[in-house]
Amino acid sequence: MSEIPGDLKFLKSHEWARVEGNGRVTVGISDHAQGLLGDLVYVELPEVGATAKANEQIAVVESVKAASDVYSPVSGTIVEVNSALSDKPETINEDAYGDGWMYVVELSNAEELNELLDPDAYAEALEDEDH
């Protein structure tokens, strides 16, 4: 398993959130999730201006093996999407925590960040999942 960046927070369903400090949060799926899915062939992103709700489905990733819903770690308004993923969904496989980000949300409730797992808790959840 790859290194889990220390600046991220996670949902147990393998989505990550990076607080950008300007009231915005960048979201993607974890390296563990992309590894389980295998080669991604399609990504359905939310539209800019759409409303994300914490723990609700906001996007879809499809691999040669399966389709998987992506849940938003936080609530707010979508202000940017990584449209490059439309042509190169495999970017998530190659760089899940970097160029493979999915969207940016303008946070509506910063308290929701406290509900997310820190990297250590996420790593523990992965270990529990493997047993």
From Swiss-Prot:
One of the protein's GO biological processes: glycine decarboxylation via glycine cleavage system
Keywords: Lipoyl
Cofactor: binding details: Binds 1 lipoyl cofactor covalently.
Keyword Phosphoprotein: no
Pfam families in UniProt: GCV_H
Family: Belongs to the GcvH family.
Subunit record text: The glycine cleavage system is composed of four proteins: P, T, L and H.
Protein name, as recorded: Glycine cleavage system H protein
Species of origin: Stenotrophomonas maltophilia (strain R551-3)
